[in-house]
A protein has these predicted regions:
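Sec/Tat signal peptide C-region and signal peptidase I cleavage site
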Residues: 9-13
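Proline/serine/threonine-rich low-complexity linkers at boundaries of modular beta-sandwich domains
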Residues: 16-25
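Beta-propeller-forming repeat regions
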Residues: 24-28, 38-40, 47-52, 64, ...
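Short beta-strand elements bearing conserved aromatic residues within extracellular beta-rich modules
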Residues: 56-59
Length: 365
């Protein structure tokens, strides 16, 4: 058990986003029902952009209304309902709009929703060491346009490495799951993408505005998409004898969120180039990546892919229109005039409308 202390800093200024003209997700009510203890079920749901400011809600369990008066000012409800029986809940907005429902099983676990996962098979490194897989980072997006989030899960092998360490790793995988555990696809990044916390940052968003989210991430020779198609040279192995990858092509790929199909692949910017330009000679600093989604024009989400922070830092923004993955801009601390930004990075970045012009800026470091 651990305790987490938080410093709460008041927000002094809000962004000036024009929500009426922003490309936003088209999500449903998002009702979630979780058994908190043997006697109570907690419900939460979304307050939608389309809801009036004075919207209120009624809650139904198995078709019978259970709240005495409409709920206003909150999207949370605690129901006295003992374990041992299944129940279906429905949240209905009083002033019109989308309803939503969720069910609780008779044997529902306490405090969480169980989603079955398909764990990848164990593997063996070139020198005989075995590895298995752990569920790692995850993101969410509505990949099929039904108004509900799916989960994009990254699988990390047990032999994954920090950039500072030598060693081979098993491949990184991405799975897409519906909330009932249905797996839609699996992407195998292949042996030419090293596994570890710094190597694979991925963005899930509806970049082209078709109502379905895409996945964008770095790929390489041998990456296999969710339909079985291989990117680049399937026979290439760019790993050196220390298990590092210091040569070979790098790509940026946008995947269809519903099928896992690679829809477009371009050369990765910022490229690796000379390792020494990033501050060392063994791909520690050159292979530290960050990524984010940002409304750079105030209307459409862009993917911002970043490389390096201890010495050189390069950020590249991309747009996907459903047909072409286009480079919007590149910021490089090695560009004359940008020298002050060198070495200012960190293990994170933030996105916000800092100057209140309705467009996002990137806070790096």
């Amino acid at each position: 058990m651990c305790a987490l202390g938080l410093n709460v800093v008041p927000m002094l200024a809000q962004g000036a986003y024009d929500y009426q003209n922003m490309q936003l997700e088209k999500l449903g009510r998002g009702v979630v029902a979780v058994r908190e203890n043997p006697d109570e079920v907690i419900l939460s749901w979304r307050y939608l952009v389309s809801d009036p400011e004075n919207q209120s809600f009624d809650i139904y369990r198995d078709g019978k209304k259970i709240n005495k008066t409409p709920l206003a000012g909150a999207t949370y409800y605690k129901d006295k309902f003992k374990a041992g029986k299944a129940a279906k809940y429905e949240v209905r907005p009083v002033k019109g709009g989308a309803s939503g429902s969720a069910s609780v099983a008779a044997d529902a676990p306490m405090g969480y929703i169980n989603i079955p996962l398909d764990v990848p098979e164990r593997g063996v490194e070139p020198f005989g060491k075995e590895y298995t897989y752990n569920a790692n980072d995850a993101s969410v997006g509505d990949v099929d346009g039904d108004g509900e989030y799916e989960i994009i899960l990254k699988w990390d092998p047990t032999d994954s490495h920090d950039n500072a360490h030598d060693g081979f790793t098993g491949p990184t995988y991405f799975d897409c799951y519906k909330l009932d555990g249905t797996k839609l696809w699996r992407i195998d990044l292949g042996e030419n993408i090293r596994s570890g916390a710094h190597y694979t940052q991925f963005i899930v968003a509806d970049f082209d505005g078709d109502g379905c989210a895409e996945l964008i991430c770095r790929t390489a020779d041998g990456t296999q998409d969710g339909t079985g198609k291989v990117i680049g040279d399937r026979r290439a192995d760019w790993r050196n004898l220390k298990g590092r990858i210091v040569a070979g092509p790098e790509y940026l790929t946008v995947f269809n969120g519903k099928t896992g199909e690679a829809m477009a692949t371009v050369d990765y910017v910022p490229p690796r180039g000379e390792l020494k330009d990033w501050g060392d000679s063994y791909a520690n600093r050159s292979d530290r990546f960050l990524a984010a989604a940002a409304y750079l024009d105030g209307k459409h989400p862009s993917a911002v892919m970043c490389r390096g922070y201890y010495t050189r830092s390069v950020l590249a923004a991309y747009d996907w229109d459903g047909k072409e993955l286009k480079l919007r801009w590149v910021f490089d601390s090695d560009t004359p005039g940008n020298e002050a930004y060198a070495g200012q990075g960190n293990h994170n970045l933030r996105v916000a409308d800092v100057d209140k012009d309705g467009c996002d800026e990137i806070i790096y470091g």
